[in-house]
Amino acid sequence: MANSDSPEQNENHCSSINSSIPLTPGSLPTLTLSGKIRVTVTFFLFLLSTIFNTSFLLKLQNWTQRKEKRKKLSRMKLLLKHLTLANLLETLIVMPLDGMWNITVQWYAGELLCKVLSYLKLFSMYAPAFMMVVISLDRSLAITKPLAVKSNSKLGQFMIGLAWLLSSIFAGPQLYIFGMIHLADDSGQTEGFSQCVTHCSFPQWWHQAFYNFFTFSCLFIIPLLIMVICNAKIIFTLTRVLHQDPHKLQLNQSKNNIPRARLRTLKMTVAFATSFTVCWTPYYVLGIWYWFDPDMVNRVSDPVNHFFFLFAFLNPCFNPLIYGYFSL
């Protein structure tokens, strides 16, 4: 049993894998036709996402230049700016890394970059997920407790800073668990095949299972639940107010009618949650399946595997289209 191995046995096992496993023809991954298609699509989405997110940032910059010099970005535009930066970070790190890694198949960049890029990859995945949570929370508070939000002008900045901070902290373990392994060729040389993996970083199998579940929860389950709850609260509040006074949609004690901008941002947050769910669900379904059944790799065809993973790259492409349509 894997979970009964002692640390000494585990270390010896890792040592043998790191130096003496012979390479046999057909036992190592290669760049297949479906892999080449994945690489092509990945770099195409990379160009689209870079153009879309950069264009939105430039549009925000032009918008601020037309306003008074000392006038700050509105609360919503500040949130969208940081979400765009997070999406751009994910685009510039995750997509090229995935594309190049699929081309080279093995890892040539050394131990240090193995750890650093693994950290940056997860950091750039946490950031946009947490920023969408911040936007959902902010919009929910703006609709359900508008007076409290107006009286606390620093709340949005605090949540933005917290999102970036948590992203950097939660990605920290990547610096420890990722490392290089070297498989030996027939002559005993360890230059045969190198890979950047988490192999033998966890003393027990359930440690890795727990870490994977924690990452999955923070990247997908918890953000999705928060977005759903926030949108449900917004819809419930608007519906209740509408039933109280069909002619005047008033929020709590406010004398002003609900501006169209708030209804527009409600639609935008719903669109965010929908895009997040559609783009990331196939990716995580495949990942969870693999956690419980590692042999599924041999049963799921290569094209299906690549197709599911490509879905995740659509999210940073869709987000700028969504907030570009609803906000500017």
From Swiss-Prot:
Pfam family, one: 7tm_1
Transmembrane segments: 39-58, 78-97, 116-137, 165-184, 213-232, 282-300, 307-326
Keywords carried by this UniProt record: Cell membrane, Disulfide bond, G-protein coupled receptor, Glycoprotein, Membrane, Receptor, Transducer, Transmembrane, Transmembrane helix
Molecular function GO labels: G protein-coupled receptor activity; peptide binding; protein-hormone receptor activity
One annotated GO biological process: cellular response to hormone stimulus
Cell compartments where the protein resides: Cell membrane
Segments on the Extracellular side according to the record's topology features: 1-38, 98-115, 185-212, 301-306
GO cellular component: plasma membrane
Glycosylation site residues: N18, N102
Main location as per UniProt: membrane
Intrachain S-S bonds: C114-C196
Topological relation to the membrane, as annotated: Multi-pass membrane protein
UniProt topological domain (Cytoplasmic) ranges: 59-77, 138-164, 233-281, 327-328
Database matches in Gene3D superfamilies: Rhodopsin 7-helix transmembrane proteins
Summary of the function given for this chain in its UniProt record: Receptor for gonadotropin releasing hormone (GnRH) that mediates the action of GnRH to stimulate the secretion of the gonadotropic hormones luteinizing hormone (LH) and follicle-stimulating hormone (FSH). This receptor mediates its action by association with G-proteins that activate a phosphatidylinositol-calcium second messenger system.
Entry's family note: Belongs to the G-protein coupled receptor 1 family.
The protein, known as: Gonadotropin-releasing hormone receptor
Organism lineage: Eukaryota, Metazoa, Chordata, Craniata, Vertebrata
Gene: GNRHR
